[in-house]
Amino acid sequence: MKPLAALVTLLMAVSGAAVAECRLALVLALDVSSSVDPTEDALQRGGVVAALTAPEVAEAFFATDQHVALAVYEWSGREQQDILLDWTLIDGPHALLAAAETVAATRRGHADYPTAMGHALGFGVRLLEAAPPCARHTLDMAGDGQNNEGFGPQDAYNAYPFDEVTVNGLVVNAGDFEGELGLIPFYRAEVLHGRGAFLEIANGFADYERAMRRKLVREVTPVVIGRLDGGN
């Protein structure tokens, strides 16, 4: 039994080391439903690229020796989800720049489908299941409207394995009266999920880069045990 026990100990040590090398698996979900016009999509895509290359974001990514794994996908209808950046371990500045360049080179796959947020969340959590071993898992759901196709976020959380996943939100076009009344409360009540989940607000797509920069810094900054904030 001693050789078997030694093997189990070794495997546990190797597994623990793999997780320790990655502190966070982060997936960004971009809304390309029909309510997002071509100019807005360009601002969204460009905002992600600019945010990933911002100095304060890079500083947060490389704040410790433990890395962040990053993936990006776009979503709209029930079956319209496309990976823009597959899992990439951001283990240095060159990896972060390459990830940003990959997103910059993408083109929108769909423009005429509704907002199937529950289906998008289901796709995102399956993508997280394929991530490298990481200590934490976060999905960032960006959008400019409420779910209007298929099942909603809460049904997704009940149907898919979200127990160990934090879902943050990035609300776009929420600076107007309609957004204040409907979209922001919807995200806070229905979309945010898990310990420490939070909401970032972009006042239109022109404000997307600023909001994404702020959100990324908060998401990838290493967590201090005992000081994980609650959602807002």
Task: List PLM regions with ranges.
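N-terminal signal peptide c-region/cleavage motif recognized by signal peptidases
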Residues: A13-A17
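Sec-exported extracytoplasmic/periplasmic mature domains
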Residues: V49-V57, G77, V125-P133, N147, ...
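VWA/integrin I-like adhesion module and closely mimicked acidic/polar interface patches used
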Residues: Q146-A189
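Von Willebrand factor A/integrin I-like adhesion domains
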Residues: V172-G226
